[in-house]
Amino acid sequence: MDSTKTNNKWAAAGILNSVGKDFVAGSVGGMSSIMAGHPFDTIKVMLQDASGNLPKFKNGFQALKYIMKVDGIKGIYRGLSVPLFSVSFTNSVFFATNNFCQSYFHPPCKDENGEDILIPYHKAAAAGAIAGGVISLLITPRDLVKSKLQVQCRPFGSTNVSLQYKGPIDVIRQTIKRDGIKGMFKGIRSTFCRDIPGDAVYFVVYEFMKRKLLALSKNNNNNNNNNDNNDNSSPKAGVPAWVAIGAGGCAGMSFWMSIYPMDVVKTRIQTQPDHLPPQYTSVLQTITKIYREEGISVFFRGFSATILRAFPTSAVNFLMYETTRNLLNSKDPFYNNNDHYNAE
Protein backbone atom coordinates (compact mmCIF):
# COMPACT_ATOMS: atom_id res chain seq x y z
CA MET A 1 0.00 0.00 0.00
CA ASP A 2 2.81 2.39 0.97
CA SER A 3 4.70 1.62 -2.23
CA THR A 4 1.55 2.29 -4.27
CA LYS A 5 1.09 5.67 -2.60
CA THR A 6 4.74 6.48 -3.23
CA ASN A 7 4.45 5.52 -6.89
CA ASN A 8 1.32 7.63 -7.24
CA LYS A 9 3.12 10.60 -5.70
CA TRP A 10 6.02 10.17 -8.12
CA ALA A 11 3.60 9.85 -11.04
CA ALA A 12 1.78 13.02 -10.00
CA ALA A 13 5.08 14.85 -9.61
CA GLY A 14 6.14 13.65 -13.06
CA ILE A 15 2.91 14.93 -14.62
CA LEU A 16 3.28 18.34 -12.96
CA ASN A 17 6.90 18.49 -14.08
CA SER A 18 5.90 17.68 -17.67
CA VAL A 19 3.02 20.19 -17.67
CA GLY A 20 5.35 22.87 -16.35
CA LYS A 21 7.77 22.24 -19.20
CA ASP A 22 4.89 22.38 -21.68
CA PHE A 23 3.84 25.78 -20.35
CA VAL A 24 7.32 27.23 -20.74
CA ALA A 25 8.01 25.64 -24.14
CA GLY A 26 4.54 26.48 -25.45
CA SER A 27 4.99 30.10 -24.45
CA VAL A 28 8.29 30.42 -26.31
CA GLY A 29 6.93 28.64 -29.39
CA GLY A 30 3.73 30.66 -29.50
CA MET A 31 5.35 34.08 -29.28
CA SER A 32 7.92 33.16 -31.93
CA SER A 33 5.24 31.97 -34.36
CA ILE A 34 3.11 35.09 -33.87
CA MET A 35 6.02 37.36 -34.75
CA ALA A 36 6.72 35.31 -37.87
CA GLY A 37 3.17 35.11 -39.18
CA HIS A 38 1.16 38.17 -38.13
CA PRO A 39 1.50 40.13 -41.41
CA PHE A 40 0.03 37.16 -43.31
CA ASP A 41 -2.76 36.91 -40.75
CA THR A 42 -3.63 40.58 -41.27
CA ILE A 43 -3.91 40.04 -45.02
CA LYS A 44 -6.07 36.95 -44.47
CA VAL A 45 -8.49 38.81 -42.21
CA MET A 46 -8.67 41.75 -44.64
CA LEU A 47 -9.66 39.37 -47.43
CA GLN A 48 -12.32 37.73 -45.25
CA ASP A 49 -13.60 41.02 -43.78
CA ALA A 50 -17.32 41.70 -43.28
CA SER A 51 -17.03 45.10 -41.55
CA GLY A 52 -17.54 47.24 -44.65
CA ASN A 53 -14.53 49.37 -43.70
CA LEU A 54 -12.38 47.98 -46.48
CA PRO A 55 -12.75 47.58 -50.25
CA LYS A 56 -13.10 44.10 -51.69
CA PHE A 57 -9.68 42.77 -52.63
CA LYS A 58 -9.07 40.30 -55.44
CA ASN A 59 -5.99 38.78 -53.84
CA GLY A 60 -3.53 39.08 -51.01
CA PHE A 61 -1.09 41.25 -52.96
CA GLN A 62 -3.80 43.84 -53.59
CA ALA A 63 -4.66 43.87 -49.88
CA LEU A 64 -1.00 44.26 -48.95
CA LYS A 65 -0.53 47.11 -51.43
CA TYR A 66 -3.57 48.90 -50.02
CA ILE A 67 -2.58 48.63 -46.37
CA MET A 68 0.98 49.76 -47.13
CA LYS A 69 -0.36 52.85 -48.91
CA VAL A 70 -2.82 53.73 -46.18
CA ASP A 71 -0.91 52.89 -42.99
CA GLY A 72 2.58 51.82 -44.02
CA ILE A 73 4.44 48.98 -42.37
CA LYS A 74 2.61 49.44 -39.07
CA GLY A 75 -0.65 48.57 -40.84
CA ILE A 76 0.29 44.94 -41.38
CA TYR A 77 1.12 44.64 -37.69
CA ARG A 78 -2.17 46.12 -36.52
CA GLY A 79 -3.61 44.02 -33.73
CA LEU A 80 -0.25 42.34 -33.01
CA SER A 81 -0.25 43.22 -29.32
CA VAL A 82 -3.37 41.14 -28.67
CA PRO A 83 -2.07 37.73 -29.79
CA LEU A 84 1.51 38.52 -28.79
CA PHE A 85 0.65 39.09 -25.14
CA SER A 86 -1.98 36.37 -24.93
CA VAL A 87 -0.31 33.62 -26.95
CA SER A 88 2.25 32.82 -24.27
CA PHE A 89 -0.64 31.64 -22.12
CA THR A 90 -2.93 30.18 -24.80
CA ASN A 91 -0.19 28.23 -26.57
CA SER A 92 1.04 26.91 -23.23
CA VAL A 93 -2.45 25.68 -22.36
CA PHE A 94 -2.77 24.22 -25.86
CA PHE A 95 0.37 22.08 -25.68
CA ALA A 96 -0.06 21.19 -22.01
CA THR A 97 -3.65 20.02 -22.58
CA ASN A 98 -2.69 17.96 -25.62
CA ASN A 99 0.25 16.31 -23.90
CA PHE A 100 -1.70 15.63 -20.71
CA CYS A 101 -4.45 13.97 -22.76
CA GLN A 102 -1.88 11.95 -24.70
CA SER A 103 -0.41 10.71 -21.41
CA TYR A 104 -3.88 9.87 -20.11
CA PHE A 105 -4.96 8.01 -23.26
CA HIS A 106 -1.58 6.35 -23.78
CA PRO A 107 0.71 6.16 -20.72
CA PRO A 108 4.41 5.67 -21.58
CA CYS A 109 5.19 1.99 -22.12
CA LYS A 110 7.63 -0.25 -23.96
CA ASP A 111 7.33 -3.46 -25.96
CA GLU A 112 9.19 -6.72 -25.31
CA ASN A 113 12.25 -5.34 -27.13
CA GLY A 114 12.41 -2.28 -24.91
CA GLU A 115 11.21 0.05 -27.67
CA ASP A 116 8.71 2.81 -26.91
CA ILE A 117 5.15 1.98 -27.96
CA LEU A 118 4.04 5.11 -29.79
CA ILE A 119 0.62 6.61 -29.29
CA PRO A 120 -1.96 5.38 -31.86
CA TYR A 121 -3.11 8.05 -34.29
CA HIS A 122 -6.74 7.89 -33.17
CA LYS A 123 -5.67 8.67 -29.61
CA ALA A 124 -3.45 11.51 -30.84
CA ALA A 125 -6.48 12.85 -32.72
CA ALA A 126 -8.65 12.66 -29.60
CA ALA A 127 -6.04 14.51 -27.54
CA GLY A 128 -5.70 17.18 -30.21
CA ALA A 129 -9.47 17.61 -30.45
CA ILE A 130 -9.77 18.12 -26.69
CA ALA A 131 -6.92 20.64 -26.77
CA GLY A 132 -8.71 22.42 -29.62
CA GLY A 133 -11.92 22.62 -27.62
CA VAL A 134 -10.15 24.00 -24.55
CA ILE A 135 -8.16 26.55 -26.52
CA SER A 136 -11.29 27.76 -28.34
CA LEU A 137 -12.58 29.15 -25.05
CA LEU A 138 -9.43 31.22 -24.68
CA ILE A 139 -8.77 32.40 -28.23
CA THR A 140 -12.31 33.48 -29.17
CA PRO A 141 -12.09 36.79 -27.24
CA ARG A 142 -8.53 37.28 -28.47
CA ASP A 143 -9.47 36.72 -32.11
CA LEU A 144 -12.48 39.01 -31.77
CA VAL A 145 -10.32 41.90 -30.57
CA LYS A 146 -7.54 41.19 -33.07
CA SER A 147 -9.88 40.93 -36.05
CA LYS A 148 -11.73 44.16 -35.23
CA LEU A 149 -8.43 46.03 -35.04
CA GLN A 150 -7.15 44.46 -38.25
CA VAL A 151 -10.13 45.48 -40.40
CA GLN A 152 -10.59 49.07 -39.23
CA CYS A 153 -8.90 51.39 -41.68
CA ARG A 154 -9.08 54.99 -42.81
CA PRO A 155 -9.98 55.62 -46.48
CA PHE A 156 -6.89 56.19 -48.58
CA GLY A 157 -5.76 59.81 -48.37
CA SER A 158 -7.93 60.61 -45.33
CA THR A 159 -6.18 61.61 -42.13
CA ASN A 160 -9.05 63.31 -40.32
CA VAL A 161 -11.31 60.25 -40.14
CA SER A 162 -11.18 58.79 -36.63
CA LEU A 163 -11.00 55.05 -36.11
CA GLN A 164 -13.72 53.32 -34.10
CA TYR A 165 -11.26 51.63 -31.75
CA LYS A 166 -8.19 53.21 -30.19
CA GLY A 167 -6.67 49.87 -29.25
CA PRO A 168 -7.32 46.45 -27.71
CA ILE A 169 -8.58 47.82 -24.39
CA ASP A 170 -11.01 50.08 -26.21
CA VAL A 171 -12.37 47.13 -28.21
CA ILE A 172 -12.97 45.21 -24.98
CA ARG A 173 -14.53 48.21 -23.26
CA GLN A 174 -16.92 49.02 -26.10
CA THR A 175 -17.87 45.38 -26.66
CA ILE A 176 -18.71 44.73 -23.01
CA LYS A 177 -20.58 48.04 -22.74
CA ARG A 178 -22.68 47.19 -25.80
CA ASP A 179 -23.17 43.42 -25.51
CA GLY A 180 -22.03 42.44 -22.04
CA ILE A 181 -19.37 39.83 -21.35
CA LYS A 182 -21.01 37.41 -23.80
CA GLY A 183 -20.14 39.84 -26.58
CA MET A 184 -16.49 38.89 -26.14
CA PHE A 185 -17.38 35.33 -27.14
CA LYS A 186 -19.04 36.18 -30.43
CA GLY A 187 -17.99 33.49 -32.90
CA ILE A 188 -17.25 30.83 -30.30
CA ARG A 189 -19.34 28.17 -32.05
CA SER A 190 -17.49 28.68 -35.32
CA THR A 191 -14.21 28.59 -33.39
CA PHE A 192 -15.21 25.24 -31.88
CA CYS A 193 -16.14 23.99 -35.37
CA ARG A 194 -12.75 25.09 -36.65
CA ASP A 195 -10.37 24.11 -33.87
CA ILE A 196 -11.74 20.79 -32.60
CA PRO A 197 -11.39 18.93 -35.94
CA GLY A 198 -8.52 21.13 -37.09
CA ASP A 199 -6.33 20.43 -34.08
CA ALA A 200 -7.09 16.72 -34.29
CA VAL A 201 -5.62 16.83 -37.80
CA TYR A 202 -2.82 19.11 -36.60
CA PHE A 203 -1.36 16.72 -34.06
CA VAL A 204 -1.97 13.56 -36.09
CA VAL A 205 -0.05 15.01 -39.04
CA TYR A 206 2.71 16.20 -36.72
CA GLU A 207 3.05 12.75 -35.15
CA PHE A 208 2.96 11.04 -38.56
CA MET A 209 5.56 13.32 -40.16
CA LYS A 210 7.76 13.28 -37.07
CA ARG A 211 7.90 9.49 -37.08
CA LYS A 212 8.67 9.36 -40.81
CA LEU A 213 11.42 11.96 -40.54
CA LEU A 214 12.94 10.36 -37.43
CA ALA A 215 12.97 6.99 -39.21
CA LEU A 216 14.68 8.61 -42.20
CA SER A 217 17.23 10.22 -39.91
CA LYS A 218 17.91 6.90 -38.17
CA ASN A 219 18.40 5.10 -41.48
CA ASN A 220 20.81 7.76 -42.71
CA ASN A 221 22.82 7.54 -39.50
CA ASN A 222 23.02 3.77 -39.77
CA ASN A 223 24.10 3.93 -43.42
CA ASN A 224 26.84 6.41 -42.58
CA ASN A 225 28.07 4.27 -39.66
CA ASN A 226 28.01 7.31 -37.40
CA ASN A 227 26.30 5.65 -34.47
CA ASP A 228 28.98 6.83 -32.06
CA ASN A 229 28.28 10.45 -32.98
CA ASN A 230 24.53 10.09 -33.31
CA ASP A 231 22.73 12.86 -31.41
CA ASN A 232 19.75 10.55 -30.98
CA SER A 233 21.84 8.25 -28.80
CA SER A 234 21.42 10.66 -25.91
CA PRO A 235 18.26 9.99 -23.93
CA LYS A 236 17.82 13.75 -23.57
CA ALA A 237 18.38 14.59 -27.23
CA GLY A 238 14.66 14.85 -27.99
CA VAL A 239 13.35 15.83 -31.42
CA PRO A 240 16.00 17.21 -33.83
CA ALA A 241 15.43 20.76 -35.05
CA TRP A 242 15.01 19.83 -38.72
CA VAL A 243 12.40 17.22 -37.81
CA ALA A 244 10.42 19.75 -35.76
CA ILE A 245 10.57 22.22 -38.67
CA GLY A 246 9.46 19.72 -41.31
CA ALA A 247 6.77 18.01 -39.26
CA GLY A 248 5.54 21.26 -37.72
CA GLY A 249 5.27 23.02 -41.06
CA CYS A 250 3.30 20.14 -42.58
CA ALA A 251 1.01 20.07 -39.54
CA GLY A 252 0.28 23.77 -39.88
CA MET A 253 -0.59 23.49 -43.56
CA SER A 254 -2.79 20.46 -42.89
CA PHE A 255 -4.68 22.33 -40.17
CA TRP A 256 -5.68 25.16 -42.50
CA MET A 257 -6.37 22.91 -45.47
CA SER A 258 -8.79 20.86 -43.37
CA ILE A 259 -10.88 23.68 -41.87
CA TYR A 260 -10.29 26.89 -43.84
CA PRO A 261 -13.94 27.53 -44.85
CA MET A 262 -14.90 27.55 -41.16
CA ASP A 263 -12.27 30.21 -40.50
CA VAL A 264 -13.97 32.40 -43.10
CA VAL A 265 -17.28 31.88 -41.29
CA LYS A 266 -15.68 32.82 -37.97
CA THR A 267 -14.17 36.01 -39.37
CA ARG A 268 -17.47 37.06 -40.95
CA ILE A 269 -19.28 36.64 -37.64
CA GLN A 270 -16.62 38.50 -35.64
CA THR A 271 -16.00 41.43 -38.02
CA GLN A 272 -19.57 42.38 -38.94
CA PRO A 273 -20.44 46.03 -38.09
CA ASP A 274 -21.42 46.61 -34.49
CA HIS A 275 -23.77 49.53 -35.19
CA LEU A 276 -26.02 47.55 -37.56
CA PRO A 277 -28.35 44.59 -37.00
CA PRO A 278 -26.26 41.40 -37.30
CA GLN A 279 -26.10 39.84 -40.76
CA TYR A 280 -24.64 36.61 -39.44
CA THR A 281 -26.33 34.99 -36.46
CA SER A 282 -25.17 31.36 -36.48
CA VAL A 283 -22.71 29.06 -38.19
CA LEU A 284 -25.27 27.43 -40.48
CA GLN A 285 -27.00 30.72 -41.32
CA THR A 286 -23.65 32.33 -42.15
CA ILE A 287 -22.63 29.45 -44.41
CA THR A 288 -25.97 29.55 -46.23
CA LYS A 289 -26.01 33.34 -46.60
CA ILE A 290 -22.50 33.85 -47.94
CA TYR A 291 -22.80 30.84 -50.26
CA ARG A 292 -26.01 32.19 -51.80
CA GLU A 293 -24.67 35.73 -52.14
CA GLU A 294 -21.03 35.14 -53.06
CA GLY A 295 -20.65 31.54 -54.21
CA ILE A 296 -18.38 28.72 -53.16
CA SER A 297 -15.18 30.67 -53.85
CA VAL A 298 -15.78 32.98 -50.88
CA PHE A 299 -14.97 30.12 -48.51
CA PHE A 300 -11.40 30.13 -49.82
CA ARG A 301 -10.81 33.88 -49.86
CA GLY A 302 -7.40 34.54 -48.32
CA PHE A 303 -6.40 30.88 -48.58
CA SER A 304 -3.13 31.57 -50.42
CA ALA A 305 -1.94 34.05 -47.80
CA THR A 306 -2.86 31.60 -45.07
CA ILE A 307 -0.98 28.67 -46.61
CA LEU A 308 2.08 30.88 -47.17
CA ARG A 309 1.90 31.76 -43.49
CA ALA A 310 1.05 28.27 -42.23
CA PHE A 311 4.31 26.44 -42.88
CA PRO A 312 6.80 28.94 -41.41
CA THR A 313 4.68 29.90 -38.39
CA SER A 314 3.88 26.32 -37.40
CA ALA A 315 7.45 25.25 -38.11
CA VAL A 316 8.75 28.01 -35.83
CA ASN A 317 6.15 27.11 -33.20
CA PHE A 318 7.17 23.45 -33.03
CA LEU A 319 10.88 24.23 -33.44
CA MET A 320 10.91 26.59 -30.48
CA TYR A 321 8.60 24.31 -28.48
CA GLU A 322 10.75 21.21 -29.02
CA THR A 323 14.03 23.11 -28.60
CA THR A 324 12.89 24.68 -25.34
CA ARG A 325 11.55 21.37 -24.06
CA ASN A 326 14.77 19.58 -25.01
CA LEU A 327 16.73 22.25 -23.13
CA LEU A 328 14.53 21.87 -20.05
CA ASN A 329 14.88 18.07 -20.22
CA SER A 330 18.66 18.36 -20.47
CA LYS A 331 18.68 20.30 -17.20
CA ASP A 332 16.31 17.88 -15.48
CA PRO A 333 18.22 15.17 -13.54
CA PHE A 334 15.06 13.05 -13.27
CA TYR A 335 14.27 12.99 -17.00
CA ASN A 336 14.72 9.48 -18.45
CA ASN A 337 13.36 9.73 -21.99
CA ASN A 338 10.01 8.19 -21.06
CA ASP A 339 8.38 11.43 -22.14
CA HIS A 340 5.03 10.71 -23.75
CA TYR A 341 5.70 13.23 -26.48
CA ASN A 342 9.01 11.81 -27.65
CA ALA A 343 8.43 9.61 -30.70
CA GLU A 344 11.96 8.24 -30.89
Curated annotation (Swiss-Prot):
It is a multi-pass membrane protein. It is found in: Mitochondrion inner membrane. The chain crosses the membrane at residues 23-43, 76-96, 117-137, 187-207, 239-259, 302-321. This is Mitochondrial substrate carrier family protein D. Residues 44-75, 138-186, 260-301 are mitochondrial matrix. Residues 1-22, 97-116, 208-238, 322-344 are mitochondrial intermembrane. It comes from the Eukaryota. GO terms for biological process: mitochondrial L-ornithine transmembrane transport. Calcium-dependent mitochondrial solute carrier. Mitochondrial solute carriers shuttle metabolites, nucleotides, and cofactors through the mitochondrial inner membrane. Solcar repeats lie at residues 17-104, 119-212, 239-327. Gene3D superfamilies: Mitochondrial carrier domain. Coiled coil: none annotated. GO terms for cellular component: mitochondrial inner membrane; mitochondrion. GO terms for molecular function: L-ornithine transmembrane transporter activity. Pfam families: Mito_carr. Keywords: Membrane, Mitochondrion, Mitochondrion inner membrane, Repeat, Transmembrane, Transmembrane helix, Transport. Belongs to the mitochondrial carrier (TC 2.A.29) family. InterPro entries: Mit_carrier (IPR002067), Mitochondrial_Carrier (IPR050567), Mitochondrial_sb/sol_carrier (IPR018108), Mt_carrier_dom_sf (IPR023395). PROSITE patterns: SOLCAR.
